[in-house]
C-alpha cells in the first residue's frame, strides 16, 4: 500500500518524469498522459472483506482482528445474476477525472506498480455522472434518459454526510483505523436498453415515478419538490405508483436512510444480436451498509417495476480508509501500523 498509495506530484501539468527518463530499462510511467493536465484526477482506495479474511475463514495477511464489523458480505438479492469474475476483490480503486485518458493512466500505472504483488481482477470504465454531488451541479441523466440522483446527498450538507457517510471512531472498536472513512457499495447494473426504448413514455414515467423532461415527481412540483406519496388522482390511485423506483428508493420510504452516490454510465459494446451492453455502474458511499443499503435494495429487487429492465451482474463492498495529507503517510496506514 505504501508503494502505490502515497501522494505524489507526477500529476502536475508539464511533468514528464518517469515516462521519458532512462533508456535501457522500462519507463517508470506509461506515458499516455504526457502533455495532459491533471483533469481534476481523484483516486479512491477501498479494502474488500477478503483482504482481512477469506470466505473459508483464512487470515492471509494477519488482519482478521481488524476486520470492520460493518464490512459484511452483501446478500444475494432477488433477481441477481452476478458474474463472479465481475464481483468482489481484495482492493478497489476508483479513479475519476474530467479526461478519461487521465483516469485510465492512473489505474494502468497502479497496476504496473503492483505487478508481482497484485493483479487486476475486474474493471469497469464509466462516463458521465449519474448523480450530482454538489448543489452547483445539474442533475445528470442515466441511459434511460431520466434525471438520476435528484435526492442524492450533497457535499455542502456536512451534517448529513457526518450522519450517513463518514465512519465514526465509536462505530466499531476493531476498526478505529477506518474513522473518517466510509463504505463503498459497487453494483454493475446492465440495462435492457432496447426493451426500454420500445416502452411508452407514460409507462416509463410510471416506472420511474418522475417526469422524463423536468424530473419532477408525478405528485407535482419541480424536480426538487418533495414527492407526495399519499397524493392520489381522480381514480383514487396514487399519483406516484407504489411500484415506482422513486417510491421505493426515496429516503422518506427507507427510514431516512440516505446515500452519497458517485456512479457512472457505461457501454461495453454490443452482443452478437446487436444489443447494447450498457447500464449503470452504481457506486454509493454509506456509513452502515446493512442499515442504509441492504433494506433498500431488498425492497427494490422485490417490488421495483424498473427491475423488469435491469440485471445486476457485478457486486462488491469495500471499506474506504480516510485520505492522507499532501505529504507523508499513505492510504490505510493506520490499518497496517
Protein language model regions, located:
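Long, histidine/aromatic-enriched segments associated with O2/redox biology
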Residues: 2-337
Amino acid at each position: 500500500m505504501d508503494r502505490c498509495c502515497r501522494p505524489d506530484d507526477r500529476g502536475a501539468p508539464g511533468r514528464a518524469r518517469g515516462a521519458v527518463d532512462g533508456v535501457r530499462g522500462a519507463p517508470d510511467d506509461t506515458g499516455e498522459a504526457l502533455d495532459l493536465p491533471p483533469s481534476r484526477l481523484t483516486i479512491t482506495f477501498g479494502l474488500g472483506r477478503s483482504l482481512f479474511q477469506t470466505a473459508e475463514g483464512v487470515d492471509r495477511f494477519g488482519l482478521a482482528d481488524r476486520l470492520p464489523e460493518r464490512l459484511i458480505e452483501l446478500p444475494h438479492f432477488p433477481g441477481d445474476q452476478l458474474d463472479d469474475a465481475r464481483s468482489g476483490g481484495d482492493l478497489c480503486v476508483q479513479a475519476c477525472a474530467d479526461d478519461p485518458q487521465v483516469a485510465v493512466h492512473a489505474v494502468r500505472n497502479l497496476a504496473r506498480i503492483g505487478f508481482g504483488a497484485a493483479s487486476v481482477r475486474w474493471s469497469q470504465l464509466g462516463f458521465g455522472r449519474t448523480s450530482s454531488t454538489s448543489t452547483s451541479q445539474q442533475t445528470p441523466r442515466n441511459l434511460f434518459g431520466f434525471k438520476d440522483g435528484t435526492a442524492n446527498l450533497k457535499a455542502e450538507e456536512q451534517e448529513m454526510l457526518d450522519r450517513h457517510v463518514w465512519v465514526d471512531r465509536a462505530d466499531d472498536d476493531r476498526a478505529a483505523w477506518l474513522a473518517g472513512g466510509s463504505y463503498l457499495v459497487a453494483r454493475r447494473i446492465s440495462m435492457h436498453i432496447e426493451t426500454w426504448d420500445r416502452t411508452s413514455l407514460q409507462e416509463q414515467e410510471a416506472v420511474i415515478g418522475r417526469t422524463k423532461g423536468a424530473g419532477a415527481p408525478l405528485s407535482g412540483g419541480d424536480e426538487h419538490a418533495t414527492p407526495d406519496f399519499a397524493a392520489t388522482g381522480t381514480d383514487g390511485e396514487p399519483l406516484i405508483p407504489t411500484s415506482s423506483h422513486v417510491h421505493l428508493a426515496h429516503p422518506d420510504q427507507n427510514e431516512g436512510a440516505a446515500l452519497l452516490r458517485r456512479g457512472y454510465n457505461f457501454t461495453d459494446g454490443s452482443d452478437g444480436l446487436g444489443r447494447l451492453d450498457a447500464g449503470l455502474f452504481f457506486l454509493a458511499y454509506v456509513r452502515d451498509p446493512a442499515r442504509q443499503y441492504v433494506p433498500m435494495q431488498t425492497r427494490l429487487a422485490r417490488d421495483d417495476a424498473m427491475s423488469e429492465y435491469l440485471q445486476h451482474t457485478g457486486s462488491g463492498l469495500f471499506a474506504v480508509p480516510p485520505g492522507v495529507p499532501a505529504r507523508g503517510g499513505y492510504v490505510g496506514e493506520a490499518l497496517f501500523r
